Amino acid sequence: MEDSHELDLTYVTERIIAVSFPASCSEESYLHSLQEVTRMLKCKHGDNYLVLNLSEKRYDLTKLNPKIMDVGWPELHAPPLDKMCTICKAQESWLNNDPQHVVVIHCRGGKGRIGVVISSYMHFTNVSASADQALDRFAMKKFYDDKISALMEPSQKRYVQFLSGLLSGAMKMNTSPLFLHFVIMHGVPSFDTGGACRPFLKLYQAMQPVYTSGIYNVGSENPSRIRIAIEPAQLLKGDIMVKCYHKKFRSATRDVIFRLQFHTGAVQGYGLLFGKEELDSACKDDRFPDYGKIELVFSATPEKIQGSEHLYSDQGVTVDYNTADPLIRWDSYENMSADGEVLHTQGPVDGSLYAKVRKKSASDTGIPSSPQGMPATSSPDHGDHTLSVSSDSGHSTASARTDKTEERLTPGARRGLSPQEKAELDQLLSGFGLEDSASSHKDMTDMRSKYSGTRHVVPAQVHVNGDAALKDRETDILDDEMPHHDLHSVDSLGTLSSSEGPQSTHLGPFTCLKSSQNSLLSDGFGNGVAEDHNGVLSPDLGLGVDTLYDRERMCGGREQKPLQPLLRKPSAPTPVQAYGQSNYSTQTWVRQQQMVAAHQYSFASDGEARLGSRSTVDNTGLAQPPPHIPVTPNRGASSRVAVQRGISNGPNPPDTQQLCPGKALQPRFQDDRVTNGVHQEPNTGSSPGSPTLDIDQSIEQLNRLILELDPTFEPIPTHLNALGISAVCPDGVGSGLRCSGRLDSVDGPGRSPGRQGDDPIGGRLRKLSIGQYDNDAASQVTFSKCGWGKAGVDPAPSLGSFSSPEDIKETVITAYPSDLNMIDGRIPNSKESSMCLTPSFPVSPETPYVKTSPRYPPFSPPEPQLSSPASLHKGREPRGCPEIISHTVGMSESPVGPKPTMLRADMPATPNFQQVFASSCTVSSNGPGQRRESPPSAERQWVESSPKSTLTLLGNSHPSESPLGTHEFCSSGKDSPGLPCFQSSELQASFHSHELSMSEPQGALPPAGSQTFLGFNTVTTATSVLPPGEDAGTLLVNSHGTSPAPGTPLLTTGAADNGFLPHNFLTVSPGASSHHSPGLQNQNVSLPGQPPLPEKKRASEGDRSLGSVSPSSSGFSSPHSGSTMSIPFPNVLPDFCKPSEVASPLPDSPNDKLVIVKFVQDTSKFWYKADISREQAIAMLKDKAPGSFIVRDSHSFRGAYGLAMKVATPPPSVLHLNKKAGDLSNELVRHFLIECTPKGVRLKGCSNEPYFGSLTALVCQHSITPLALPCKLLIPERDPLEEIAENSPQTAANSAAELLKQGAACNVWYLNSVEMESLTGHQAVQKALSMTLVQEPPPVSTVVHFKVSAQGITLTDNQRKLFFRRHYPVSSVIFCALDPQDRKWIKDGPSSKVFGFVARKQGSATDNVCHLFAEHDPEQPASAIVNFVSKVMIGSPKKI
């Protein structure tokens, strides 16, 4: 049958068609037959067929067929386990979308690949077996038995059996580390005359060579077995192939003795035994003895197995270690892609120009990326890296389902599973899980690799059983970033896990030699995935059939139908979705510069205001996926805890940070009924449910197992995560965007637990079907807008109840940005992330050693268009870019306190209003003259969640790209004479409270021109000038100007009697009155960017303290916690205990006396440097004026702070001891200890020093009067680091040292290394390049990872074509420069600049070697690398 020269088209079932072409048929015959088949399919099925191409990718096949998935793998081989799941999922998804859909399985060559797909899908559909599918399964079984089974290879059958066992639950996954020590051949094949054999082994992991043995020469005595020792032992994980060759005697050819493929998850114990019938190639080769067997011996550690010394030597067998022979090194799988496509699953692409080895530049699609870290072939003596993913991360999960999804059936939807089927699936899913990795997904017709999901570059290194060939290699070192790597992505010896799938304790026909295995997952399966990839929910299939099919499933129709909205009707008990924007961090060149971070969260109550995610097309920025996504627990924590957390809606997983490529096809969303982030609910209900849901869950769980083994694995998306529409990055933002987000599910009292959503806004970029975009003219970038909308009226909402006092936590309101790109919805450009520990080289300026603070010109926001929550459903939306800043954790069920109401906060609708709360959000509220469209009985509610309550700052942010400037808040009120106006560019507030709420009369309308801003009703006019006698702000006055209802807690902040703070930062006028509420007894207002502080006291309580809070438990954040500007608040709260204030009502109109609010710039970012040392503080201050100071974290006293200040003259004791005048400069910097006590912070050892509520208060007071200090403090107006960098070359050198300590890395082309004798300088680079250009044959070039650190330059061959790793210490690197003649190097694209560095030849004191490189990424020029090496690495030791 295989030798037939005609095509074979078979209807396996009515909807599954198998089309095969023999490999021997001519190209002309193939094309002719292909055209006939295409015409027949189009005539009979129209465009309702999907082609699964199991062979190599072909342009003509793509051209003739509208929908095609290239999922091929090498002929006669087994596919990776994840690819089998991908194909099954694609079939199931396509066939369930439309009854008219059919699947065409295309294969040119051996039909064994068709057999793999048919049999896998047969087992796959058996998971949710139904009577109507029984006939199809029978037809597939008959086709398999009659036509295909005999044509399949043993490894193909082994993989099908393994998948069947996993799906049925008959097999368990083994995640124990497996180190291969021996491959023993029982029975010697007879390949040469006289029965001789010269075998050698090659080990492949994810189709990448990881080990090559020496050549074993079997003597004439012909021993009964050959023991091939694997030295060092190889850690194998995932899809493994062992291929044994025979090297012909006196011939440059080799024959395959046997080939076997298996998955490490199926290995039980530490031994495998394969008979001849289980070996590919050997099963049909008469030269392999019938009694022959192959035995694999594993262990859990790389150390030699005790008692196995006799296995290392065989009499009559000699080993040739000449593995430099090209025949031995040749990888037959290296050039499987004829068109030069990437032969691996692309790793995370963060747009970073200098991604680490395990990443890949977004601009280069032809160069495979490589895993980062030490390869498995490293010497086993690195004991600190011998723990594998499974053994050190604790990823054992309870046998519980991690996804609790609610799906509502619509008329016409497929029936759900029966309870019995549900129980079976529960059993199946007890250990499976899926969490999408950040692998970039391929387009259906434009995949980067025809072996997607199977090709992970695992650097190949030829290892021999000895010390040969070491003279050709330079030092192999461990990457100094290894300790910082998440071991979830690096195996026990540093090898990045390749494409691996589930593991089992049973391997089908394998004969297990040992079963004494300590399973790490005895009660479940690993469910973690690659680090920082949590929730990158990309609905495509990893191979292109993404939104086209999933959208049809969601909508129950074709792609022309709109997306199914993701928010259910109010009547459906839906878990609350909370939305969070990024928590980003920016590494700066100077280590002392503070990181800027911001958290933005929001939540909506069930039946009340709901937060949605806008999916309509907008020009303003980044797309954000809808929040209706099930969460799977993160890696990093105990998986058992994570599973329980996922089921019980406990604490949410930590924020994840995901990377987003710079350019992309931009999807078109057609849901025109979505406005301002609130999805309108149609009458059709929610997404249809079907057995697909359960299979989706099964595949999710199965893929989680694969990801447990291989963090780089590209999972198979399912319907569950298809709802999470991936975001795309705007073209103009740049390639360094990092986007992440978070969905927090908050359960209030009486609300049924639901699933948590974790939905990064920046998810992995997806390329959608070209056919889906043929009518997309606009091709605009989407931006998700968030807003509040009334989803319904709950007459008796069971939402709010105050927490008990002991549940009080701190919630930080972070209003940033330092990079004001957030104004238009973009994420600040950050090339460094938690995933990229080594930053890229600085480009512009070429080598900045001190990063200056950004300066932002002021701007005035336009007049916002405000809309009520109900109006959001009617298509109205605010003009501003809404970004909700809040942080919700959970609802306390304490039954105390009144029903909370909404705290409204709107920016004044005046063009001249100076916006302070940067990047704040527009909340839907009643604008002037607008009616509330919600029923009169509805009460606008916004509830502060306890125990971690939140005040949300809601304002209007400008959609333009102009950054936010400094703004002034000046009051014309008569109650604030003499108080100055201060500037503030970024404000941050932190509140301790039970409940911050504000009542609003039903149906109330705000007066024209007034808007509530942070609870202060600010009356504005066209010119922002108030009439005489009016104050600028009102404290806690609702939009109608009426007082809150009795018993409603009030937000009142200020300083009543603050003797130490004459300049009150937030002043409440003495005449302001407020209601007293017990719920506010423990409310605290403080600076979030301050050290741990105690609770503050009321003015009327004297010295009585409401309670002491230790620094470690108070919840206060220190100044370096991420904010650069803060709102300083006094250390004494308004006195609520005075009867006069309790009795006096709030003013009823803006004409009454109002509260005056003053803001002042927080300068803590200038004087608080947490991580600097005592010596660095001295260096910063010794040339400053007396009174200059720095506050830092004390290194000697944990939890305390050190105050270093410059004084005019040193103390007399110092003058007496130090007679030398030269020593006095350092003695002029004096050091004081600031201790943290339950009462506050104070200078230690000074009896006349009072306690202060914050560091800011202490500093401010001492800037007014010195108290116990030698002189008053001078509050700086700019960062002293910048000043020193400008004035002192020594500090620049220190900054360079810090920069070098941080290191920089990139990928470059390695061209050649040329010996230069003693020549150095530009001449050496010029001569080396000239010699390279004329060299015949030209030297082989390859992509290497080029890392510069304090240790020197480290080169890692991404594919190990030329070497593994080379290290050049700092002391050996002499010179680095561009080619003086500016010659370019051309390699499959635009020309690149050439640079090189000169280093001492190893073992020589005079000879030099020039190493040449070329730019790999044009956006990262060679000049940046040269500058870094020359000025930072080579230059810094000379300066310091």
Curated annotation (Swiss-Prot):
Keywords: Cell junction, Cell projection, Hydrolase, Phosphoprotein, Protein phosphatase, SH2 domain. GO terms for biological process: bone resorption; cell population proliferation; endothelial cell migration; lung alveolus development; negative regulation of Rho protein signal transduction; podosome assembly; positive regulation of cell population proliferation; positive regulation of Rac protein signal transduction. GO terms for molecular function: guanyl-nucleotide exchange factor adaptor activity; phosphoprotein phosphatase activity. Its EC number is 3.1.3.-. Residues 1305-1439 form the PTB domain. CDD domains: PTB_tensin, PTP_tensin-3, SH2_Tensin_like. GO terms for cellular component: cell projection; focal adhesion; podosome. Pfam families: PTB (PF08416), PTEN_C2 (PF10409), SH2 (PF00017). This is Tensin-3. It comes from Mus musculus.
